[in-house]
Amino acid sequence: MELKLLNENGQEGAVVNASDVVFGRDYNEALIHQVVVAYQANARQGNRAQKDREQVKHTTKKPWRQKGTGRARAGMSSSPLWRGGGRIFPNSPEENFSHKVNKKMHRAGLCSIFSQLAREGRLSVVEDIILEAPKTKLLAEKFKTMGLDSVLIITDTVDENLYLASRNLPHVAIVEPRYADPLSLIYFKKVLVTKAAVAQIEELLS
C-alpha cells in the first residue's frame, strides 16, 4: 500500500510503501463498530446510583389498616409503587459496563480503520514534526500552512515542544502508536503519521 508523504507545506511529494496487512485490509464495518463500542464501554465509570426500597428514608409503619378502608393494600411507604419509594432494579456504581474483544479482533479492527483512512485520503505520512519552541502559535501556523484543522498526530516519540504547543489547540491530539485508539482515528478529520511511527504501527498490528 502506498501512503502519501507530505512536505512542510502540506503538499504531496513522494510515497511511502506500507504493509498491505495493516494498510491494505478490506473495510469491515461490523468489526469496527464492535471495537469502537467496546472501547467506549470500557471507558465508562460507575457514576450513577439509585436507591432500592431498603435504602430510601421511610418508616416501617403500615400506612393504613389492611381491611375496611376500601383502599389498596399497603405495607410501607418504601414500596416501589409509591412516589418517593425505592426503585425495583436501581442503577449502581458497581455496575460493570466492560466489553471483551479478543486481541486478534482488536488488531484487525484497527487495521481496517487504518486501511479505510488511507483509501479515503485522510491518512498521510510526514518525515517528522519539529518545533523550535513550545509555542502554540508556531504549531497553529504550521497546521494552517498544511491546511489542517482537525488532526490526530501519531509519532514514534512525543516531542515535549510539540506536546506543550498542542495542548491549547482544539481538535488536535498527539499519541504514540501504542496509544492510538479506534475512536480517535475515526473522530479526527486527518491523521498524520511520522515515518518512524509507520514502522511501529506495522510491528504492533501485523
From Swiss-Prot:
Residues 46-78 are annotated as: Disordered. HAMAP family: Ribosomal_uL4_B. The keyword RNA-binding applies. GO terms for cellular component: ribonucleoprotein complex; ribosome. It comes from Burkholderia lata (strain ATCC 17760 / DSM 23089 / LMG 22485 / NCIMB 9086 / R18194 / 383). The keyword Cell cycle does not apply. Part of the 50S ribosomal subunit. The gene is rplD. GO terms for biological process: translation. Keywords: Ribonucleoprotein, Ribosomal protein, RNA-binding, rRNA-binding. This is Large ribosomal subunit protein uL4. PANTHER family: 50S RIBOSOMAL PROTEIN L4, LARGE RIBOSOMAL SUBUNIT PROTEIN UL4M. InterPro entries: Ribosomal_uL4 (IPR002136), Ribosomal_uL4-like (IPR013005), Ribosomal_uL4_dom_sf (IPR023574). Belongs to the universal ribosomal protein uL4 family. NCBIfam families: rplD_bact. Residues 58-70 have a biased composition (Basic residues). GO terms for molecular function: rRNA binding; structural constituent of ribosome. One of the primary rRNA binding proteins, this protein initially binds near the 5'-end of the 23S rRNA. It is important during the early stages of 50S assembly. It makes multiple contacts with different domains of the 23S rRNA in the assembled 50S subunit and ribosome. Forms part of the polypeptide exit tunnel.
